[in-house]
Amino acid sequence: MNSLEVTDLRIAIGGRTIVNGTTFSVGKGQRVCLLGESGSGKSLTASAVLGRLPANAVTEGSIRVNGVEVLGVPASKRPEEARVAMVFQDSAVALNPLVRIREQLVEPLRRHRGLSRADAAQAAVELAESVGLPDPAGIIDRFSAELSGGQRQRVCIALALACNTRLMVADEPTTALDVVTQKRVLDVLKKYTAGQHTPALLFITHDFAVASELCSDSVVMKDGDVVEQGQIHSIFAAPENPYTRELIRAARAATVDPYVQQFRRELAELRAEDAAEQPKAKVFYDIGDVSREYPMPRKGLFGKREMKTALFPTDLVIREGERVGIVGVSGSGKTTLLRLMLALDTTDTGAVTCSGREVYPADVKKLKWYRRKVQYVPQDPASTLDPLMTVRKLVREPLVRLGVPGDHDTMVREALDSVGLDEKFLHRRANELSGGQAQRLAIARAIATRPDFLLADEPVSGLDLPMRESIVALLRRISEERGTGIVVVSHDLSMVANLCERTVVMHAGEVVEDRSTRQLLADPRHERTKELLDAIPVLHVMPDALEPAI
């Protein structure tokens, strides 16, 4: 008997069919990935398996968990043998911020395993240790807000294991994590699923490379239909559907391996370039001895407030027109440095100068000169764009506020055209756009004032691979056509390899490596750079025809 059987599943919401006759299964001891872009129907299919469909959903077909029919049965009303554990994409939302981690683990251990409070408390520590949390007895006495993203995600896996189910569903659990933390989370999932006494796994993702690291089988969805399924390595070797082929090609382009191999072949040439004196453009950013520390929460009512150094004294020079990637794991100091460059925070020591003029937080009027020269591309455009404003008003807003001379309507159209949004988008509202369209809008809004530099914070981390590839290509084209410099903060060396000529690696608040991207990938010198490279998922099987051009 399979852990999960989905047969001819159809789901319609508001009269629109979103899942159209999906059929697949997850056997005992299997890890199966459900692959597809946003809107493919994969997450809605997972919601049906979990019994979490919206109230207005109309369903047909069958879903059996351990032989029990569960389609249309809410999770709370399912029998014990048909329960499904869940690992959510956003661990910050999944965990209760007002309850300590210990209590959140103890509750399912008592409910689903019948343990006493004392035994459950001990089992909670053991679970925390098993998923690789440091100082497990101490860390579970914290609140979720006191943990890093990777630690929270491992707590979510521990919670799922505490439920003692035969099936676990993980919905994009590593999308928001840096590659090193992602690898650790995947290792935990690998260790504690698909065993004789551990649950089978249905893994939802858009990333073939991540899927290939974890799963044995794959179900590929597009527009609510299953277009291909089978053993994941067989699909890699000979994808039958054009859509599958495109997903694999995009995944290959998003890995760093082809760049590393090419640059290593050119290593002697790169070393010669390194030794040669290159002509240098004018300095745009001169970051001198900047540092920043923040107060930590007090331990107890009268406890001493400790300070945490987010950025040790750092020097960095960025020249006009450069494309620079600042990479590192969570907590490396890269976002703190970006905030200082954006004048959103003050330095404790040192200064940031732009074209010889010091930049520091002040009122909006005093920073107009700087906002004209530098614009920001956010990680999550949905959180920065007013959902009730039209596209036209959103792109026009910085032109008006910064007093940019000229015909603003023409400038708006030019900016939208540059990012591939035609005039039909002018009167749409921000909440009517897809994730990729919203990111293009954020870029259009940033380039409308014709800045000298764009500062981008993880600009593609939340996007599907094909959309991620198109946004990176767009940023590169804008830089080449307009001479616009770009500083992009990311944990993803593969994205930086595709966009940036120079890469700065940060760790624990310090710059540990700063070289041309080609040289850094071909011959990484620092252990943290090597760790970032090693953590990037690799497609183990790949058709020669899909090799990307470099």
Specify the residue positions occupied by each region the protein language model found:
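Conserved ABC transporter NBD signature motif
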Residues: 58-71, 350-359
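ABC ATPase NBD coupling module
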Residues: 69-85, 103, 111, 234-239, ...
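Conserved ABC ATPase signature
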Residues: 143-147, 151, 429-433, 437
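Conserved ABC ATPase "signature" region
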Residues: 119-138, 407-424, 534
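ABC ATPase "signature
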Residues: 226-230, 238, 514-515
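Helix-to-loop junction immediately C-terminal to a conserved catalytic motif
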Residues: 50, 342
